[in-house]
C-alpha cells in the first residue's frame, strides 16, 4: 500500500510542493523569504478579515470605527497593529526576495520572474488602498494625490480620475470601493502565488552558485522546513517586538487626525515602503513624466532578464557586478530617505541624481559590467 500523501490527489500536490520537493543542497537563508512572504500573506488575510468585521467603510464613521477597534474590541489593538506592521514586514521580505532574485540571477526563470513583478504591483496596489481605509489626514490626501496622477494620462486622464473616485473628489464612493478592492485583492494575490510556485516548480530552485544543481538535490522536508521555521521565528519576533513596543514607529502622526478636505498637511507622503518610488515621481518636474518614471521604477525589473549579458548566472563570482548591486541598494535607501523629506534644496537635486543613478545602474552599468567580466575571464 502506497503512502496516502503520495497517492491521494490533494495530498499529492502538497507533498510534491512542500515535502518531497527536490531542492538544491546549497541554498542559503536568502531563499527563506518566499515562505516568509506566504506567512505574511496569511497573517494579513486573517487579521484583515477580523478587522473587516468591525470596520465601516463610510466617510462619517470609518475613522471612528478604527478607533473603536483599538479601544473597545477584545485585542482589537493587536489586530490593527499586526495588520499595519505586518504590511511593513511584507514589504521588507518582498524587497529582500526581489534583491535575492537580482543578485543570484533567479530572473532567468522568466515566467516565475514576470508573475513576481505582477504580484509586486498587486501587493503595492493593495497596500495603497489599505492605507486609505482609516480615513485619517494622510489617508485622504494620499488617496487624492496618488489617484490624481491618473489625470496626467493624455485625453482620458480627467475622465479616468473621476471614474476611479466615483465622483468629483475623493469621497464616500471612493472609500467604499477601496475597501471592496482591498478585501478582494489578497485572494487574487493568493491565486497568483500558486501560479508563481507552479512555474518555479517546473524549473526547480536556483542556488547561490548559479550552476544547475540537478545532480545534488535534497528533499525539502525536513531540511528546509526546519530552516524556514527558524526564519519564521525570527521574523515573528521582529514583528511582535514592533507591534508590542513601538506600534506607531513606521506610521504617520497625521493619520491620527480625522480626514479634513479643507486642511492640507504640510508634507504629504506615503508609507515608508513607497518612498523610493515617490522620490522618483517627485524628481521629475513634469507630471506625465513623473508618472511614467514611477511606473518604470518597478517595471524596469521586467527588462533585467533581457539585459543579462554575463556568461555566469549569479553574481557570486562577479565582483564588478557585486559593487554595482550594493550601489543600487545604497541608491534605493537614499531614494527612500529623500521621499520622506520636503521638496526643497538640497533634497531636490539629491533625489534627481539618485533617480538617474537608479535607472543608469540597472539599464546601462550592470550590462556593461557583465560584458567587462566576460572579457576578464578570457585573460
From Swiss-Prot:
Mark the transmembrane ranges.
33-53, 77-98, 113-133, 178-198, 226-246, 288-308, 320-340, 347-367
Domain of life, per the record? Eukaryota
In which organism is this protein found? Answer: Rhinolophus pumilus (Horseshoe bat)
Q: What else is known?
A: Heme 1 (or BL or b562) is low-potential and absorbs at about 562 nm, and heme 2 (or BH or b566) is high-potential and absorbs at about 566 nm.
Q: What is the designated name of this protein?
A: Cytochrome b
Q: Any idea which UniProt keywords this protein has? A: Electron transport, Heme, Iron, Membrane, Metal-binding, Mitochondrion, Mitochondrion inner membrane, Respiratory chain, Transmembrane, Transmembrane helix, Transport, Ubiquinone
Q: How does the entry describe its membrane topology?
A: Multi-pass membrane protein
Single GO molecular function = ubiquinol-cytochrome-c reductase activity
* BP terms from Gene Ontology: mitochondrial electron transport, ubiquinol to cytochrome c
Annotated positions binding a ubiquinone: 201
Q: Which family does it belong to?
A: Belongs to the cytochrome b family.
Report one GO cellular component. Answer: respiratory chain complex III
Entry annotated with the keyword Cell membrane:
no
What the protein does comes down to: Component of the ubiquinol-cytochrome c reductase complex (complex III or cytochrome b-c1 complex) that is part of the mitochondrial respiratory chain. The b-c1 complex mediates electron transfer from ubiquinol to cytochrome c. Contributes to the generation of a proton gradient across the mitochondrial membrane that is then used for ATP synthesis.
Identify the residues that bind heme b b562. Answer: 83, 182
CDD domains attached to this UniProt entry: cytochrome_b_C (cd00290), Cytochrome_b_N (cd00284)
Which cofactors does this protein require?
heme b
| Assembly and interaction partners | The cytochrome bc1 complex contains 11 subunits: 3 respiratory subunits (MT-CYB, CYC1 and UQCRFS1), 2 core proteins (UQCRC1 and UQCRC2) and 6 low-molecular weight proteins (UQCRH/QCR6, UQCRB/QCR7, UQCRQ/QCR8, UQCR10/QCR9, UQCR11/QCR10 and a cleavage product of UQCRFS1). This cytochrome bc1 complex then forms a dimer.
Binding-site residues for heme b b566, renumbered to this chain: 97, 196
Cofactor binding mode and count: Binds 2 heme b groups non-covalently.
Entry's localization field: Mitochondrion inner membrane
